[in-house]
Regions:
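Conserved ABC transporter NBD signature motif
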Residues: 59-70, 75
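Conserved ABC ATPase signature
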Residues: 130-134
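Hydrophobic anchor residue at the start of the ABC signature
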Residues: 144
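Catalytic Walker B motif of ABC-type/P-loop ATPase nucleotide-binding domains
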Residues: 155-158
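ABC ATPase "signature
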Residues: 213-214
Length: 223
């Protein structure tokens, strides 16, 4: 199986608004693929479709070879998803959040600790602190650990560094580069071109449409 994600004419409407308009592209296995575009471009809608949280109104898509409609339950076992807003439990500690998500996926933390260890070691000194009391950068690292705890084949990250400082942003992308080296396929949205250039390829989107798919340098050259 060559592609981790395949999207063909995917469409989503909310009433009279077409949030996604026949979107098509592929993410190769082991690829770090960026989705770049302004607010309202349809990025979050696409992530929600791929994470099987909403159903499409047209077109098809597959994640890790599984159809997002017919195989939605199996996809949820194979995908790690970080939504744009912090979605962990603010009143649970760092350690409790991680344990909760491990239990949710039916795994033991020790099973996949090698995957999250480089990230978790940075927040482990705060493991007793409530998640809601962490800094923005620490929250994102915890959310990434929770998204990885079941060792997903595909990682979906919706603007994971929005609202965090420049140093934390750079550290986060360093972590993504390490995960790519471990064979995890990733689709990451970002409003920042300095982040997009760290991707293998990017899709430029606006108004629910894909305007271009190319290397970051290729997209810059065309626009």
């Amino acid at each position: 199986m060559r592609n981790a994600i395949e999207i063909h004419a995917l469409t989503k409407r909310y009433g009279i608004l077409t949030a996604l308009d026949e979107v098509s592209f592929e993410v190769g296995r082991g690829e770090l693929f960026g989705l770049i575009g302004p607010d309202g471009a349809g990025k979050t809608t696409l992530f929600r479709l791929l994470a099987t949280l909403v159903a499409p109104d047209g077109g098809t898509a597959s994640v890790d070879g599984l159809d997002i409609v017919a195989d939605y339950k199996r996809i949820r076992e194979r995908v790690g998803y970080m939504p744009g807003r912090f979605s962990l439990y603010p009143d649970l500690s760092v350690g409790e959040n991680l344990a909760f998500f491990a239990a949710l996926f039916g795994v033991e933390i020790a099973e996949n600790y090698d995957l999250i260890a480089p990230i978790y070691r940075q927040i482990e000194p705060f493991r007793a602190r409530r998640a809601g009391k962490l800094s923005g950068g620490m929250k994102q690292k915890l959310a990434l650990c929770c998204a990885l705890i079941h060792r997903p084949a595909v990682l979906l990250l919706d603007e994971p560094t929005t609202g965090v400082d420049a140093v934390s942003r750079s550290e986060f992308w360093d972590m993504l580069s390490e995960l790519k080296g471990k064979g995890i396929s990733m689709l990451v949205s970002t409003p920042y071109m300095d982040e997009a250039v760290r991707c293998d390829r990017v899709a430029l989107c606006d108004g629910g449409k894909i305007l271009a798919v190319d290397t970051p340098q290729g997209v810059v050259g065309r626009f």
